[in-house]
UniProtKB/Swiss-Prot annotation:
Oligomer and partners: Monomer.
Enzyme class: ligase
Species per Swiss-Prot/TrEMBL record: Brachyspira hyodysenteriae (strain ATCC 49526 / WA1)
Zinc among keywords: yes
Function: Catalyzes the attachment of isoleucine to tRNA(Ile). As IleRS can inadvertently accommodate and process structurally similar amino acids such as valine, to avoid such errors it has two additional distinct tRNA(Ile)-dependent editing activities. One activity is designated as 'pretransfer' editing and involves the hydrolysis of activated Val-AMP. The other activity is designated 'posttransfer' editing and involves deacylation of mischarged Val-tRNA(Ile).
UniProt catalytic activity: tRNA(Ile) + L-isoleucine + ATP = L-isoleucyl-tRNA(Ile) + AMP + diphosphate
GO MF annotation terms: aminoacyl-tRNA deacylase activity; ATP binding; isoleucine-tRNA ligase activity; tRNA binding; zinc ion binding
PROSITE patterns: AA_TRNA_LIGASE_I (PS00178)
Pfam families: Anticodon_1 (PF08264), tRNA-synt_1 (PF00133), zf-FPG_IleRS (PF06827)
Enzyme Commission code: 6.1.1.5
A GO-annotated cellular component: cytosol
UniProt record similarity statement: Belongs to the class-I aminoacyl-tRNA synthetase family. IleS type 1 subfamily.
Leader peptide range in chain numbering: none
Protein name in UniProt: Isoleucine--tRNA ligase
Amino acid sequence: MDYSSTINLPKTAFPMKAGLKEKEPKIIKKWEEEKLYQQLRELRKGAPKCILHDGPPYANGDIHIGTSLNKIIKDIIVRYKSAKGFDSPYVPGWDCHGMPIELKVQESLGDKYKETSKFIMRKKCRAYAQKYIDIQRKEFKRLGVMGDWENPYLTMSPEYESEIVEVFAQLVEKGYIYKGLRTIHWCMDCETALAAAEIEYDDNHTSTSVYVRFPVLNKINDKLDGNVDVMIWTTTPWTLPSNMACAFNRDLEYVAVEIDGRYAIMTTSLVDTVLSKKDMKAEGRDMIPVSMEDIEKLEIAHPFIKDRKSAVVFADYVEATAGTGIVHTAPGHGMEDYQTGMNYGLEIYCPVDKAGRYTSDFPEMQGMKVRDANPKVVEILENNGSLYHKEKVTHSYPICWRCKNPLIFRATSQWFMNMTHDDIDKRTVKALDNIKWYPTWGHDRMQKMLENRPDWCLSRQRSWGVPIPAFYCKNCGKTLLTAESTRHFAEIVKTKGMDVWFELEAKDLLPEGTKCECGSTDFDKEQDILDVWFDSGVSSFAAQKTNKDLDGVFPVDIYLEGGDQYRGWFQAAIWPSMAIRGIPPYKELVTHGWTLDEQGRAMHKSAGNVVSPLEVIDKYGADILRLWCISEDFTHNARVGDNMMKAIADNYRKIRNTFRYLLGNISDFDFTKEKIEVKDLLPVDRYALSRLHSFIKVAEKACDGYEFHLFYQRLINYCVVELSATYFDIIKDRLYCDRKDSVSRRSAQTVLVEILDVLVKLIAPVLPFTTDEVWGYYKGENASSVHLELYPKADDNLIDLELEKEWTSILKVRDDVLLSLERARDNSTIGKSLEAYVTICTKEPATKELLTKYEKYLNEIFIVSKVTLSDSKDDTFIEGGVSFVKTEKASHEKCVRCWGHYDSVGTDSEHKELCTRCAEAVR
């Protein structure tokens, strides 16, 4: 008789092949048609809020792998928080203003750019930004990111721009905003000032360094009267025309060293270094100490500008680590130089225009770019005998974040936010202690960046952005910037848009009757715009006003961005918040690392190692990319490449096959009617249920701490080792061969349903497409989405640690049995494990007691036909970790249905080819 039809084989239409590339777009369409995001908002209405505030990506170009990592991790967190019962809306945003877009539009205009008005330029920039907002929105949705995509916050929307101006008004009102002449970082190519957040560093920049003699005009002391120079060292020869002083340090010792018939003053500790540049030594050389009193009365001439003297100043930043211990000081071309110049009343001299060319103030080199000027300056020094030595040095040098070209320091009049007003610097550093940092080192990193930070340069000399709403009296030149005038403009922007600044006259943008102190009502408008970091920095204010789901939520719970944002958005956001609200805008600050190629190299188009997320999705599916995002600790740099994706896809298949096994083996089971009570479950089923709820705790702890890589590792181990290789293996015979409605079979199915229900919910935040598909097969096509479900709760009553401890010991014995079976296969004693009888001699009495307790289940646990426990062993036993095991060929007949070799085979008169269990199952 053929008994194959009596086997309870798994039945499910859930396919083994994922086909994510084809399925995922259909699932997205289904979510949109069902308004899943809106359903979730309605379902969580009134629940505690948990807001992850989106740091706005720049609306320029397609998304890259780093952007994908950022958005996916955010989405996993938001989905997880929603599953935990929080009302966790996700409002995406875009950073729309700024130089990259303006330069792209400028490039597209070509020669017409110079003839294009600011109004037209802004219109084109707006269209360009909107184009990429639409492109990126589609790409983010394809990643499976769920959010309010139809109502994002855009820094170029009238509502948002109005709030930027309103926040600026509050800062004006509180006394934080001022305009002043400062030496700041300047990009000659972009022709604009830059703030600290926009500066990068080239660690391998090569500069021309020069040692220069500045002639001393007066008698210093009885030994030094004529033929004396002050020796300075600089890596920016082009700034020498702007020299106004030589800076000394009162804590250093100075000496005049005879070199080629003249004396050169320098710090004593650097004499050997300076002389070595010319292969000279100090030994036998005349050296005369120079006192502070001598230094204070020095009269120093500029080395090549006639009738200009270089003042003597003192500064703590002058060190004896390099150079000569005397610093060339040009207040118009250095931050420290500027401060020293202010302290000593020096002229803030800067003969360089916005394009980096010398002006008519230095006619000898008028029109020359300063980046090309070093050879000319060196030539002048050589010709007049002032050059002691020149050489190339490699060092770290500031470059523009946008064009990557070297920056200069340039003294210009700019708008600033005062970073010491009302002790905001001290209050902000102290407030860092109230923030949770992931990883924890973020606190110290941020603190170092905030301490002694210079005032925030807010003005930019561009057109695509939010104008600084200041006015200038045409009659007396005084500046008009008040909270009242700024708020008035904010209201105009709210209804008419920001472009009115470029369309209307100043009088139409000011409150009626506005007058200057001189009585004039005639004003000019400021031409500069606000730093775009200010735009995104005030998003915690502005996004609230543009989306009802965020209204009234402050501070938000989470900011999550890459590590570069410590000097960018994280800082830009904290300063306005501390100034206006007195607290940081975020409770938790989470940082992710960079994405690198498989060899750990940075990705560059020129290197041909760029990994496109869209190509990954097209090949593997978004769920595979999402699984990669949690496969490693995202707070560290993450490597990505095709080999890694193949490995991730392999693990995904293991997860998918776990779901397929679960669905297939509960197809004939009605949980509500046929479930077995916990107290009646078979021991291995109770153990599996306990392990499931222990897993929930592990998963929850990992996800609460954003350690998704730990969840991933535990998930793969759970699916592959605990379920597939162990529990599923043990219960397979019972599921397939026990009577369909037997308690033993229903016991296993009861636990399988529990595992499926928990597992699909645990994984849902990470694999939204796959779990949605699984949920449909589990609950039926018309069931509501799994993403509306709550996260599983671990039931402590179902966690039996003593039982888990027992089974840990049993499974160690199982490992020993599997080893013995493998040896028996190798020597052809057996084929399949059911052909084996095993005898076990444990190393510890307690282990035997445990096996005796579960003796009736050992055949099932070890998947053999007979198990005998013995107190003795011989050399036919194989030694394992906790026991000795002997494997023998089964001596009884094989049951043709279950393939076990039992002494009961042939005892049933009706079914002589079956064992007793199988005969009962087929009646």
